[in-house]
Amino acid sequence: MTMSRLPLAVAPLILLQACSSFNSESPQSAPQVPSAELSRPETITPQTYVMRGQAVIGHETRTIQPCGSQHQYWLELPKNVRPEAEKLTRKPYQPVYAEVIGYLEPPSHRGFDSDYTGRFVVKQVNMLTAENPKRCDQPLRPTQVLGNEPFWSLKFDNSKQASFAMMGEDKQSLKLKDRKLTQTTRRYEFDDANLQMSNKLCNDTMSDTLYGWTGVITIDGQTRQGCATLSNSDTTLSWTGNYVAQSTETAGFTVSMTLLPDHTAITRYEYPDNSPATEERGFWQQLNNKQVQVIMTRHQQQYLVSQRIFTLDGNKLIAKQEKVGDIVYPIANGGLVLYKGE
């Protein structure tokens, strides 16, 4: 089977030779993480992460523009969330601020999502609000629970301590003794209180805000119920940066890859004869603490899905296979080796 992309990407990778004289640091001892491989699709499971930004939620358009980005992804919301999200706005396609937890998938070839680099599949809502859609400039926030009548809040100061505040009273510091976390529940035991969080949609009666969690706290002999959010920090951003191949003597071109904080990815193939560079665009996401998945969905602005899984080794990333369409190709000469720039 012949593909038009093959001479531009797969074939150059087969020719590519990366520098082999680099002495990598010995890996630190850590729990064994199952390795993902393109030839074994069942091993590939993206970790969920937080994406926050401005969203538009309507019948034919559902998008999210990540904070600090000009890029948009198609937003795939759970069926039970869409009607609740649409109730937040007073007019169709009114922007809202969104914090959603999930992962990216390639868009369909045809359909509402086909014009986008990827579609963000939402597994959990952290927060949706129409009250102030321009919240990207606000500082990142820890896990917190908020309640009304009277207003009260519990916010985590760090992994071992939280603060409880109620209007008109002094703030209380709570030392964490134990916690049990699952995908749908979180239970925290403090020295003088306990908190139970559940992954259920929660409406704030005082604002146009939808929260993804409910929280029940028992403190000083009283039980209070409120709405809750998890921390809105994306903990996978350590992968971001520019990566280049150090040796391309036999290939006759330079390969570079850029992973951006909005999870977009760009791969460029540049040639010494000043012919136009070949560019692919797509997205990236963490599979585990040692592997990152990079999926390209546009080749020279044309729809084409290709995928590589890079494994971290010291300060370099190594991909030994590439999947174009449904076919997995081996990358010769030890694979594509990219080094992170300063």
Regions found by a protein language model. Name each.
Residues 53, 90-116:
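Flexible glycine-rich surface loops and low-complexity tracts that mediate binding to linear polymers
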Residues 15-18:
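C-terminal motif of bacterial Sec signal peptides marking the signal peptidase cleavage site
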Residues 20-23:
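Bacterial signal peptide processing site
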Residues 206, 210, 216-281, 290-342:
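Lipid interaction determinants
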Residues 56, 60-62, 68-87, 101, ...:
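Contiguous, well-ordered beta-strand patches that form the walls/edges
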Residues 47, 51-54, 59, 129-152, ...:
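Tryptophan-anchored aromatic micro-motifs
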Residues 107-135:
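OB-fold/S1-family single-stranded nucleic acid-binding modules
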Residues 27-56:
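Post-signal peptide N-terminal segment of mature Sec-exported envelope proteins
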